[in-house]
Each structure stands twice: as C-alpha cells, then as structure tokens.
Design a protein with these regions (language model features):
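Short, basic/low-complexity N-terminal boundary segments at the transition from targeting/disordered tails
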Residues: 2-25, 129-136
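C-terminal regulatory/interaction regions
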Residues: 2-4, 10, 253-277
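Active-site HxH/HxHxD metal-binding segment of metal-dependent hydrolases
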Residues: 9, 61-64, 71-155
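Conserved beta-strand hairpin/beta-sheet module of binuclear metal-dependent hydrolase folds
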Residues: 22-73, 77, 177-199
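Short, flexible loop segments at the rims of nucleotide/cofactor-binding pockets, characterized by
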Residues: 31-35, 58, 83-86, 203-208
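Divalent metal-coordination and catalytic microenvironments
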Residues: 32, 46, 56, 66, ...
Length: 277
C-alpha cells in the first residue's frame, strides 16, 4: 500500500505542477454553457439572468485560474450563485472553498460527498496511507462550507437554469453526474457532465464494482447531444475546441453522441476486465 501511495502522490504532485494546473483559453461550448477549466482539470460555467452556476472547483491553486477565465469571457465570479461538484478528490473539490469566498455562492453537495468536502478531502474509503497524507495537509485542501445536500434525482435551479443530479458512484460513493438542457439558437441540446468512472480499489467500499456498473447503466439512459467529464482529455476538449474555431457552426464539433456511447463502452469493458485507472 505504501508503494501505491507513493506512486499516487507522485502523480498528484505532477498534475499539480503540470497537467492539472496550466491555464487554457476559456470558450463557449453552446448557448450559455462555457468551459472555464485548465488544460485537463475541468470546470464549467452555466450563465443566467438571475445568476450563474459553476460546476467543479479544481485544485486549490486552480481557483484563481477559473476566476480569470470567467472574467475573460466577460462574466463576474461574484454573479456565481451556486457551486456544484462532481466528486471530492483534491483535483475537483480542492478549490471550492476559495471560489466560495470569492463569489459568496451556495455549495450543493451529494449526501455521500458532503462530509469529505467539509473536512478538506478526508474520506474513509481512501486507503490509509493516502488518508495520512490528507491528515498531514499534503493532499488535503481548504474545507468547503456545504450549504445544501442533495439526493439522487434532485434538480438544482437558478432562475431558468436547471441541473439534475445523478449520483453515479464507483469512483467515490457520492460521485455525481449532471444533466441539463442548453438552448443554442433554435436548438435545445441535452448536456451530460459525467463523473469519473474509474476506481481505486479499497476494502472499505465493497459495493464499488456494483455501483460502477449501475452508474454506467444510468449514464446510458441519459440523452446526450453534448457530453463532458471532469477531466478534459476524456471528452476531447482540445480537439473539439480547435475544430470549433473553423467550423461553420462552432457548436457542431461539441455535438458528439457517438463519442458519449464510446466512452461508456470503454468504461464497461474496463469494468468487465477488472481493470481500474
């Protein structure tokens, strides 16, 4: 376990210094739906006349990057009224407290993720060596104030914005995917933001494989014209963004139901093989 922990810490520190912390150009995906994350750690802004929703918090040190991206698009972080989260690991929950202080937004969390977010990343399902690193502050992050806890199937609203929560456990117990409509011109597009479907096997979460299988089934049942995930490389952020800069309609490269099905097929094949990532 100590070897695994060291490998994971190395990956985390590498992501912190390189992959997860490089700012990238923010852009509109479709309608009122924007990408404001880094080159790989994703964050999304959904804008509305009564306030905005920000999905995911990144690492503690990416929060300022997210806010800079929001400003570059012409919006104000102080107009973010709701913060949402996919899962409480440091690369997605670590910056929520910083964003919360900057915006004054209310944080909604799944019942199974709330305590971890409020504790700065502690989770009884994390293997003990990694929990020790969280307790020591090496892998921990500033605790977030959880204002509301939601259940599977709840809908979070800010004016005309409505996002439905789908608790898709496996990566963590409270891992949450989101579905919501986006109006782009005369098209009403279905968007799915899928939570991580990979697992880090742990003896304290014996339902992990069953939850992962259920999550894939749930996600297959969600119509997705546009799909994204909490890591940009999985849904082809860069490729789709580049294609959008020359497309007749810049939204078209992001419409990818075939890619969504392929992503779920790959996750199911990984599950059947017993592999994790």
């Amino acid at each position: 376990l100590s070897v695994v922990a060291l490998v994971l810490v190395g990956r985390w520190l590498n992501a912190t210094k390189v992959g997860g912390q490089q700012p990238t150009e923010p852009f509109r995906i479709a309608g009122n739906f924007y990408y404001v994350g880094t080159n790989d750690v994703a964050a999304f802004l959904i804008t509305g006349p009564e306030g905005h929703v920000l999905l995911d918090g990144g690492y503690p040190s990416t929060a300022l990057m997210f806010m800079a991206s929001i400003a570059k698009l012409g919006f104000d972080t102080k107009d973010v009224k709701v913060l949402l989260n996919s899962e409480p690991h440091p690369d997605h929950g670590g910056g929520l407290a910083v964003l919360q202080r900057a915006s004054g937004a209310q944080l909604w969390a799944s019942e199974a993720s709330a305590d971890s977010l409020a504790s700065g990343g502690d989770d009884p399902d994390i293997i003990l060596p990694l929990r020790g690193l969280i307790w020591s502050g090496i892998l921990g992050y500033p605790p977030a104030r959880v204002d509301h806890r939601f259940k599977d199937g709840d809908t979070i609203r800010v004016g005309p914005i409505a996002l439905t929560a789908h608790v898709t456990g496996g990566h963590t117990r409270g891992c949450t995917s989101w579905s919501f409509p986006v109006r782009d011109g005369d098209r009403l597009l279905n968007v799915v933001s899928a939570c991580d479907l990979g697992v880090l096997a742990t003896s304290t979460y014996p339902e992990q494989a069953a939850d992962r299988e259920r999550s894939i089934r749930v996600l297959r049942g969600l119509p997705a014209d546009i799909w994204v995930t909490c890591h940009a490389r999985w849904w082809g952020r860069y490729r789709k963004f580049v294609a959008s800069t020359t497309a007749k309609n810049p939204v078209d490269p992001f419409i990818d139901p075939e890619g969504y099905r392929a992503y779920l097929d790959a996750a199911e094949a990984e599950l059947r093989s017993g592999r994790t990532h």
